[in-house]
A protein has these predicted regions:
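Extracytoplasmic ligand-binding site segments that recognize negatively charged/polar headgroups
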Residues: 63-70, 92-93, 105-245
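Short, polar/charged alpha-helical segment
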Residues: 47-52, 63-85, 99, 159, ...
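Periplasmic-binding protein-like
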Residues: 140, 155, 219-223, 230-231, ...
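Bacterial lipoprotein signal-peptidase II cleavage site
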Residues: 19-36
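Conserved C-terminal helix/tail region of periplasmic/extracytoplasmic solute-binding proteins
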Residues: 340-369
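Short beta-strand->loop
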Residues: 127-136, 149-150, 178, 264-276, ...
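A ligand-binding cleft/hinge motif common to bilobed small-molecule-binding domains
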Residues: 116-120, 242, 247-265, 315
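Mature extracytoplasmic/periplasmic domains
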Residues: 280, 285-342
């Protein structure tokens, strides 16, 4: 059946400050008011298919957030003759691996994961600049001004609640981020380590911006009292909740999470005091063995409505319409009222300082295996 996400994406006006905002003090992001939206412009129809491929060969090695994207890459392989190898890896792990490889990446293309890691990789000189004609159709707020990364959609964050455990524990489901601090949830909340999960890094940085630095860190210190552990994978919270191990998981929300409602006794909660969100990135690695194939894949993806519709089907979300407003065949199904106002420039600029402070906060609750 048709699933409905709450639309929590305030078109482009809520993120128009991306390029203009500057970083605040280390580890203490300061929100910047969103700019007034610009008048609507009649979009130019987008092409249905990508431009003809250049002469490509060899293998395109991809690191992606999961293996469900193979359908998209199989289409690319069929149209170009390039073989594709895909390795599933979280955005934080990709960034750590990139830095460890010292400028000689073992992969060519980075597909998916929180944009904070892509911003940091650009600053470290680890990404390849990509330029193509159709990039002008992409919203400025969701692409790097210099062409080092592009966003393929947005991920939103909420709670997945185990109804059975709620009944057994005689507790009610949390409705807000503030509710998570109630003592009744002690030891019943699972969250992914924000150092490896772009989704949960979005939670941390967005809440720091919402509450302010000192109050924000006070919040996470209090929340830590109720956290059972911080998982190494972004999927850990939902996996532990559907396995009846914990009552509440702080998790990304998309069609795959909504499908769980038909299989398990769980519910989705969209916290009414604000929804954190994070753009998902795409980039080519600098000095990659097959960087030309990686660069063409990015052009191939964003130049074709057909390819973007396939991506939306795989992701089970319509937020790619925000990335490419003239995309045909997809309409947003989102109510944007309670999306948190975020300054994305702080996500990359303060990533290291924020994660260092959060690592100290987690202590031995961070799972490393």
């Amino acid at each position: 059946m048709k699933k409905k996400l709450l639309s929590l994406l305030l078109a482009l006006s809520m993120v128009a400050a991306l390029a203009a905002c500057s970083a605040g003090g280390a580890g203490t992001p300061t929100p910047t008011p969103a700019a007034e939206p610009t008048p609507a412009v009649e979009p130019t129809p987008a092409p249905e298919t990508a431009p003809a491929a250049p002469a490509l060969s060899g293998t395109l090695k991809v690191v992606a957030t999961n293996e469900t994207y193979m359908t998209l890459f199989e289409k690319f392989a069929a149209e170009t003759g390039v073989k594709v190898e895909l390795l599933s890896m979280s955005s934080g792990d990709v960034l750590s691996k990139l830095r460890a490889e010292g400028g000689t990446p073992s992969a060519d293309l980075w597909f998916g994961g929180g944009i904070d890691a892509f911003m940091s990789a650009k600053d470290d000189g680890l990404l390849e600049q990509v330029s193509f004609a159709a990039s002008s159709d992409l919203a400025d707020a969701f692409k790097d001004a210099d062409g080092y990364w592009f966003s393929k959609g947005l991920t939103i964050v909420g709670f997945l609640v185990n109804n059975t455990l709620m009944g057994e524990l005689n507790i009610t489901a949390p409705a807000t981020w503030t509710d998570l601090l109630n003592s009744e949830y002690k030891g019943e909340i699972v969250m992914s380590n924000p150092a490896v999960s772009g989704t949960n890094y979005a939670v941390v940085n967005a809440m720091l911006q919402k509450l302010g630095g000192e109050a924000g860190w006070d919040y996470f210190n209090s929340l830590n009292e109720n956290i059972a552990f911080y998982g190494k994978r972004g999927s850990d919270p939902k996996n532990k909740v559907i396995a009846d191990e914990y009552a509440v998981g702080i998790t990304y929300i998309d069609g795959t999470i909504e499908d769980l409602l038909d299989e398990y006794d769980v519910s989705i909660v969209y916290p009414t005091d604000g929804i954190p969100w994070m753009p998902d990135g795409v980039a080519a690695f600098k000095n990659a063995d097959n960087v030309e194939a990686a660069k063409y894949f990015i052009e191939w993806l964003f130049s074709s409505d057909e390819n973007l519709r396939l991506l939306a089907e795989i992701d089970q979300k319509t937020s790619v319409k925000l990335i490419k407003p003239n995309l045909e065949g997809i309409e947003l199904d989102y109510d944007t009222a309670i999306l948190l106002d975020e300054d994305l420039s702080l996500f990359g600029a303060q990533r290291t300082a924020v994660l260092e402070q959060f690592e100290a906060l987690m202590g031995d609750k961070a799972v490393n295996d």
